[in-house]
Each structure stands twice: as C-alpha cells, then as structure tokens.
Design a protein with these regions (language model features):
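N-terminal helix-turn-helix DNA-binding core of bacterial DNA-binding proteins
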Residues: 22-63, 89-96
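N-terminal leader segment of winged-helix/HTH proteins
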Residues: 1-31, 77
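Beta-hairpin "wing" of winged helix-turn-helix
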Residues: 76-85, 92
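Base-recognition residues in the alpha-helical recognition helix of bacterial helix-turn-helix
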Residues: 41, 68-72, 87
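Short, charged/polar, Gly/Pro-enriched secondary-structure boundary elements
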Residues: 97-101
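Short, charged, intrinsically disordered terminal tails
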Residues: 102-111
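Alpha-helical residues within the helix-turn-helix
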Residues: 58, 69, 75-76
Length: 111
C-alpha cells in the first residue's frame, strides 16, 4: 500500500534544498514569538511607516533591551529595516517580506 498522495496534474512540487530551508527557518523562527508579531503590527500601523524603539516598549510592557533584542531578530530575518538617527534607531517593515516568506512555502511548483 502506497501512502503517498500523487501530484496534481497541473503542477509538480519542487522540494526545498537545505540552504533555502535554513533561510526560511530564520524567518519563521523570527515570527514564532508573540512579541515579535506584535512589534511588526505596531510598526506597520504607524502613519509614518516607522517606529522608534523608544515608542515600542510601553505597548509591549517590556524593557528597552528586550524590545531591542526582538527588533534585531526581525531585522536579521529580513522582516524589518533599521535606520540609526542620533542615539535612536527607527524601524520599518520591509514591503512584501512577510508575504515572500509565506509564498516561498506555497509557490514552489512548476507547470
């Protein structure tokens, strides 16, 4: 008895190579923390499209070092950008980065 589901006739799935899987894992690991998801939504909701770390501590109820750590993880995963202005860092969401992460899992097909 074969338990494999046959591929759909329209498309053939392409498995991820180990390097691509490792890159995806970084992004998904960054999103695996509720505080990081909250940070992304807070920054995305800003009218200016960016937020200073000093404005993100209170909504999360976390200290500045902890918030800065979470922001660094999101930057390293390519989900946020960071711009230093004087003593403060400002963060903005990378356009399309979240969607690209999810598309990499679902759109790995060839006709």
């Amino acid at each position: 008895m074969d338990c494999k589901v046959p591929p759909t006739p329209q498309a053939h799935r392409i498995p991820l190579d180990p390097e691509a899987a490792a890159e995806l894992a970084v992004g998904f690991k960054a999103l695996a923390d509720p505080n990081r998801i909250t940070l992304l939504t807070l920054i995305a909701a800003e009218e200016s499209g960016e937020a200073c770390v000093c404005d993100l501590t209170e909504p999360l109820g976390l200290g500045q070092p902890t918030v800065s750590h979470h922001l660094k993880v999101l930057v390293d995963a390519g989900l946020l950008t960071r711009e230093k202005r004087g003593t403060w860092s400002y963060y903005s969401v990378v356009p399309g980065a979240q969607q690209d992460l999810f598309n990499a899992m679902t759109e790995r097909t060839t006709p």
